[in-house]
């Protein structure tokens, strides 16, 4: 049997691929909200879909339900600057994430919160494997 003859689960079930992509985004931050550091329970679009934001790794970040709901359809960078828990290190991490530099984003988040434990340090693999939702 050749590799071209193989059938892959993600080809048969797009929801499986989407679920794996979402899990990989949470793993990047050790399952913590990129905005406040609490446990992440959702994926937030930094640039909202209503403003043309895409469902790509660079535009989707792990967020707690509180931050995701409060931010709503606002641009994350503008919204984040007005929060009481604003941290310039996290703001730089959000900017790095948007620019596709996940390695820098994770380092900045670890600087802001040394308790973050990243399970998967292979940023390149996850970034390319789960590019779009």
Where are these regions (language model features)?
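Intrinsic disorder/low-complexity signal
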Residues: 4, 10, 43, 125-128
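Short, charged surface segments at domain edges that flank catalytic/cofactor-binding sites
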Residues: 1-31, 88, 95-104, 108
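A detector for short metal-coordination/catalytic motifs
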Residues: 58-59, 69-133
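Histidine-centered nuclease catalytic patch
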Residues: 32-62, 71-83
């Amino acid at each position: 049997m050749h590799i071209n003859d193989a059938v892959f689960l993600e080809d048969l079930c797009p929801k499986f691929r989407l679920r794996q992509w979402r899990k990989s985004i949470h793993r990047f931050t050790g399952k913590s909200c990129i905005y406040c550091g609490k446990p992440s329970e959702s994926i937030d679009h930094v640039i909202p879909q209503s403003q043309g934001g895409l469902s790509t790794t660079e535009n989707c970040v792990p967020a707690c339900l509180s931050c995701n709901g409060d931010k709503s359809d606002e641009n994350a960078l503008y919204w984040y600057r007005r929060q009481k828990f604003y941290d310039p290190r996290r703001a730089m991490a959000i900017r790095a994430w948007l620019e596709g530099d996940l390695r820098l984003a994770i380092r900045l988040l670890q600087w802001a919160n040394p308790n973050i434990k990243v399970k998967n340090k292979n940023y390149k693999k996850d970034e390319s494997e789960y590019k779009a939702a």
